């Protein structure tokens, strides 16, 4: 153990003078995965687990990549807004689910409410009811491999430039959803469910 590392403390007991909690300092996430609380400042190049490829460290690496891409997108949008280039596109407010019983299996119709009005139901998508129930059933499924995670990020990166400039809000929402999935997976790993 290096001199600036200490065994992981849950923070149940206040530290500092007069029992007051000291301000929260950033700790190395990789060290935290392996049971140590190491201050982050000046530590990145010397981290023992810098090249660790365990499941938790791989998840942290993916989360860091996604968050970095999200921050870059936010900065780009702010810069475009300052220059007067950015034109926000209204996103769907809510999805309305309609159930239709017909044929052998029941189906759900997802409609997104938006400001555009069309006479044809092109914005509606038909899916089977079993497909809607899959995320709840897959809650305890094994986590995706790093190759699958890479393919997910590659799919986001493969969006053509026209889509990114025409609909920056759409890409931002996709990245936010990916971050939420990574955070959920991280939480499940910490709980020992995976």
Curated annotation (Swiss-Prot):
PROSITE patterns named in the record: DM_1, DM_2
Compositionally biased tracts (Polar residues): 1-13
Residue numbers spanned by region Disordered: 1-23
Keyword annotations of the record: Developmental protein, Differentiation, DNA-binding, Metal-binding, Nucleus, Sexual differentiation, Transcription, Transcription regulation, Zinc
SMART domains, A to Z: DM
Compartmental location: Nucleus
Lineage top rank: taxon: Eukaryota
Gene Ontology biological process terms from the UniProt entry: cell differentiation; female gonad development; female sex determination; female sex differentiation; negative regulation of transcription by RNA polymerase II; regulation of transcription by RNA polymerase II; sex differentiation
Tissue: Expressed exclusively in the primordial gonads of ZW tadpoles. Specifically expressed in the somatic cells surrounding primordial germ cells in a ZW gonad at stage 50 during sex determination (at protein level).
UniProt function note: Transcription factor that plays a key role in female sex determination and primary ovary development. Acts as a sex-determining protein by antagonizing the transcriptional activity of male-determination protein dmrt1-a, acting as a dominant-negative type protein.
Similarity remark: Belongs to the DMRT family.
UniProt name for this protein: Doublesex- and mab-3-related transcription factor DM-W
Organism field: Xenopus laevis (African clawed frog)
Gene designation: dm-w
């Amino acid at each position: 153990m290096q001199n600036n590392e200490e065994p992981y403390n849950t923070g149940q007991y206040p530290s500092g003078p007069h029992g007051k909690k000291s301000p929260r300092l950033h700790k190395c996430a990789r060290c935290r995965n392996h049971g140590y609380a190491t201050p982050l400042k000046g530590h990145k190049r010397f981290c023992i687990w810098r090249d660790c490829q365990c499941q938790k460290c791989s998840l942290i690496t993916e989360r860091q990549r996604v968050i970095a891409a999200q921050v870059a997108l936010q900065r780009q949008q702010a810069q475009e807004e300052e220059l007067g280039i950015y034109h926000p596109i209204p996103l769907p407010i809510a999805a309305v689910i309609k159930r239709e019983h017909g044929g052998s299996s029941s189906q759900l119709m997802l409609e997104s409410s938006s400001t555009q009005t069309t006479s044809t139901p092109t914005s509606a998508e038909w899916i089977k009811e079993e497909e809607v129930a899959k995320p709840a059933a897959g809650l305890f499924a094994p986590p995706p491999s790093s190759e699958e995670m890479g393919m997910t990020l590659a799919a986001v990166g493969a969006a053509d430039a026209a889509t990114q400039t025409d609909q920056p809000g759409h890409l931002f929402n996709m990245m936010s959803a990916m971050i939420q999935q990574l955070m959920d997976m991280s939480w499940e790993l910490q709980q020992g469910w995976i």
